[in-house]
Amino acid sequence: MKPQLLTPLRRRPWTCRQCLQRLQRLQQQTRRSFETAASPAPGHTQVDYIPADASQSKKVDDETIRRVFDSQHFWREFSQRRSTQSKPTGLVQNQYLTSPDGFRTFANVSLQKCQAIVSKVLAASTLEEYRTMARDLDRLSDLLCRVIDLSDFIRVIHPDPRVQEAATQAYALMFEYMNVLNTTTGLNDQLKKAVANPEVASHWTEEEKIVAQILIKDFSNSAILMPPQERQRFVNLSNDISQLGSSFVNSPEPAKSQVVVNANSLRGLDPMLVQQIKRWNRTASVPTTGMIPRLALRSVHDESVRREVYLASRTSSARQLHRLEELLLKRAELAKLSGYSSFGHMTLSDKMAKSPEAVSNFLTSLVDSNRTLVREELLQLRNMKGSPLQPWDHAYYVHKRVMQYSQSRRSRELSAVPEFFSLGTVMQGLSRLFDRLYGVRLVPQEAAPGETWNPDVRRLDVVDEADRHIAVIYCDLFSRPNKHPNPAHFTLRCSREISATEVAECASLDQSSHPNDGMATAVDPTTKTLRQLPTIALVCDFAEPAAHGGRPSLLSEHSVRTLFHEMGHALHSILGQTRLQSISGTRCATDFAELPSVLMEHFATAPSVLSLYARHWETDEPLSERMIQSMERDRTAHGSIYGAVENEAQILMALVDQEYHSRPADGGRIDSTALYHEVAQRHSSLPDPAETAPPTSWQGFFGHLYGYGATYYSYIFDRAIANKLWADVFGAGRAAVDRAAGERYKTEVLRWGGGRNGWQCVAGVLGPSNASNADGRLVEGGDEAMREVGRWGLGRDGVSG
């Protein structure tokens, strides 16, 4: 998450270098003890993907990571060994979180530290005090984030209601305090004095300068500079927007809840579903929300029924449209109050795009680059129908084409693909890939009692080529009752340099006190300073392995890509270790944050990467070249059926988002339906008919208009950049495991976190010889750079059946 000024988004007890060396020796002994248990099953053909000069412990780690995810028996032995030898610890090693009451202590201790920093900043008067101000405020932000980010995660993921409630209270306490700080004018005044003083700013590192500007921007966004009356209006508008947005997202409603048709006209729809919705008088009530209308549009043969269901399912209630239009008006007024011409201009001012005009340039350029592919797809569907295609025909004829393809091309091989994608082999493949590209790998680590929130959570330590510990990942990947099903990456604590002053302060407070609350730290070998290491949680909802041997959790190709996507976010956190937490890892511009994760999806099915991990769970046979080619043909075939039209739909949504949020505050009431149809008529190849009464108003179901207001373009923007990097840096897969390509990407993009302008990252990784970056045209960004990214296009990648 990113609150304003002090922005939240994690460590074993602090030790000296000698202690770290002892710990490494202990880890090596532990790994050796598992060497026998981790060996391949008898009869398996073992192909060694580890370099010949690799250490024995590295080979054991490589096999162990597969077993801890695939074998419940092995996992029980592995996890219980630490449980019988270690003292209990707190959640994610946080020394306070050994019980629900610990959340209150954690929040209060952090609050006291925050208050001490605030007092120091407000009292600053000497040159030296102003020179430490950027770091002081970054530490203040970190203290808030420590509580807010971790509590926010635990209250959602922990199965114990008492822990959930305690985490919620800690979250609320610190969030309320953060809001107080965001309106503390003295902090803003002092920071501005520091920035304006050349004798201060000249002593700051580039990171400190960037963080200072970020904090000033955050203060500005909280209306801190406004007179009291205007500030109160700002607060009121913000509250109104929050309430309207929540209602808009949580209460979508169609104008009609159902469409009544003759039951006999539903031929093609599953007869069991027809029976569920059939009424006594031979009619059927087709609901206009949920799965049934989507299935009807795919399968009902009668075009008139499809038309009626389509129009009704895309027409919102007047009440829902009123919520949206009030939300847009309030946002426009908020922007005007803040000195911006529109909400889009306010939101985009610190993004790569900078302005709504630049986003529109990107999107219209993307429409042009996608148009030929769309026409090809629609022509194929029109030929199937034999007459002009209508919007309500698309899903129906796409489904027919997919079924034809499946019957004619899909072989038994494709249905067997998940047999080669056990969760353990995929995690093993990720570790091998990271080792090849970036010189880091994933090492299973036994968690201490109390460290994880559920017994099936696996802990992975990330280590570099010198076996130095650089990050912690908690993998909560298996399904359980009441667990949120959506895959996600959470940064529980950002990386950051811990000053000697903080270490001394901790020692003076309490013998048991720890400068990182007990969570993972390491000594930087270059600067000899203590660092808090990034601590990450990956959450998915995969099936558990069989309890007593047998079949592990097998993933579909889509699930493999999802896991690679989330690990792309984690990689950004792992390698983007800055000295200040405000710009570490994924804390970058919204329209740059998805680049590492989207790019990682390309690696998932690249042949050279598949050779690192895709092996049959039972026989250990590798995925054959023929099967890899079949997967590629399958993706290409599905992409050619509907990939470009799906891309156009995403582009259209982004254009609608920009149109809504670029309206000036004094432009009067917004007719969201008229604007939606104007955009669709200009840019959609298959727009909704505008002459129906009432006209369709699909925008009422577009919940992302609240959460991603003015930034919905970000994902497809990063997709376009990722496609370019995949082609030009990683050779469209030919250099997918090439160390030079990986180092180039790490050096120019990942290691900076949010400490470098995104355009500089893109220009740097492409290099000056790349035609798209001729004369360094991308470095400064701007309208033409946005158009250039639009010309790169989206292709049809990412589509699989």
Swiss-Prot record:
Give a GO molecular function annotation for the protein. Answer: metal ion binding
Residue numbers spanned by region Disordered: 31-54
Q: How is the cofactor bound?
A: Binds 1 zinc ion.
Question: InterPro entries recorded for this chain?
Answer: M3A_MIP (IPR033851), MetalloPept_cat_dom_sf (IPR024079), Neurolysin/TOP_dom2 (IPR024077), Pept_M3A_M3B (IPR045090), Pept_M3A_M3B_dom (IPR001567)
Cofactor (UniProt): Zn(2+)
* CDD domains on file: M3A_MIP (cd06457)
GO biological process assignments:
peptide metabolic process; protein processing involved in protein targeting to mitochondrion
The primary location reported for this protein is mitochondrion
Catalysed transformations (reactions): Release of an N-terminal octapeptide as second stage of processing of some proteins imported into the mitochondrion
Please list the residues that make up the active site.
Answer: 566
**Which Pfam families does the record match to this protein?**
Peptidase_M3 (PF01432)
| Transit peptide, residue positions per record | 1-41
The positions annotated for binding Zn(2+) are 565, 569, 572
GO cellular component term of the entry, any: mitochondrial matrix
Q: Where in the cell is it found?
A: Mitochondrion matrix
Q: Which UniProt keywords apply?
A: Hydrolase, Metal-binding, Metalloprotease, Mitochondrion, Protease, Transit peptide, Zinc
- EC annotation from Swiss-Prot or TrEMBL: 3.4.24.59
This molecule's function is given as: Cleaves proteins, imported into the mitochondrion, to their mature size. While most mitochondrial precursor proteins are processed to the mature form in one step by mitochondrial processing peptidase (MPP), the sequential cleavage by MIP of an octapeptide after initial processing by MPP is a required step for a subgroup of nuclear-encoded precursor proteins destined for the matrix or the inner membrane.
Family named by the database record: Belongs to the peptidase M3 family.
Q: What is this protein called?
A: Mitochondrial intermediate peptidase
What gene is this protein translated from? oct1
